[in-house]
Amino acid sequence: FVATIPASAAFNKSRIIDDFVFNAYNTMSTAQIDSFLNSFPDSCISTSRGFKAPNPTGYSPGTSFTYGTSVSAGTIIYNAAQAYKLNPRVILATLQKEQSLVTGTAGCSKLRYVGAMGNGCPDSGGGYNYSGFELYRIGSTVVKSVTGTCVNSAKSAGFSRQIITAVWKMKFWQQRSLGNVSWAEIHGSWDNSDDPALCYTYYMTPGNRARGGTGSGCTQVLSFDGNYTIDGTGVHMSTGATAALYVYTPHLHGNQVFVSTFESWFGSTLSNPVKLSYI
């Protein structure tokens, strides 16, 4: 599902994106996101096309994610960015990397909408079926069922669920890779107070980092050098955001597409050439 690579600057496999850029959640407003989408005549998720999906409205340990009435893609992306303090441009670049929904150049099939972020879509493929809840809508046509999607969980199936669960994962993985075991977004209708108990066993940035959690394999404190192998190539996890994106897409090519897409639209994924304090 990964798109082709547009022209861009050289790809630094060990520093995909800086944490400062990754965390810049106020880079675009709802109106700016919708305007950006409308600038592509064939966009699958523009207001010009009449696209809407349920609005992610909150999270709590007891009810998980909650959703409201259908709203524009810009509203969904903005609200997810605000909820987990993630740059909405990261979301837009991921939507394009995975399904080309921003430009619409690969078509606007139901499967692309339902697996919008490639979230929960393993390399082995899918073949999952879901029904009984709104996945998205175009104009007055509401889509409530899908057959053969790559998405392996109903919690992540459909445009809005793809967005909000992917954004949470990216931010959780970033924070854990930095050793922040107490991270949890708790504000307004968002209460992720159950996050500190979750196990994390993926890529870590260098230093003495706590994994946290109570699951199998969750050693509390270990020393990591930040060096791993991706697609047979040595990679150094220089930033938490870099580690998070490799957990999300454990391949060089997919992350190269992400960087190329982001930089062609929004500029560099790096805040400056100076190394951050935790590198």
What positions do the PLM features span?
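Secreted/processed peptides and extracellular or luminal domains of membrane proteins
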Residues: 49-59, 114, 127, 205, ...
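Glycine-rich, acidic and aromatic/proline-enriched surface loops and short helix-turn segments
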Residues: 96-101, 169-172
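Export/targeting segments at the very N-terminus of extracytoplasmic proteins
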Residues: 19-20, 24-99
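Extracytoplasmic/secreted cell-surface and envelope-processing proteins
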Residues: 100-106, 110, 152
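Non-catalytic cell-wall polysaccharide-engagement segments
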Residues: 8-35, 43, 124-279
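Sec-dependent, cleavable N-terminal signal peptides
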Residues: 1-9
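Structural recognition of the beta-strand scaffold that forms the well-ordered cores
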Residues: 90-96, 118, 162-165
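Short, surface-exposed glycine/acidic/tryptophan-bearing loops
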Residues: 57, 107-123
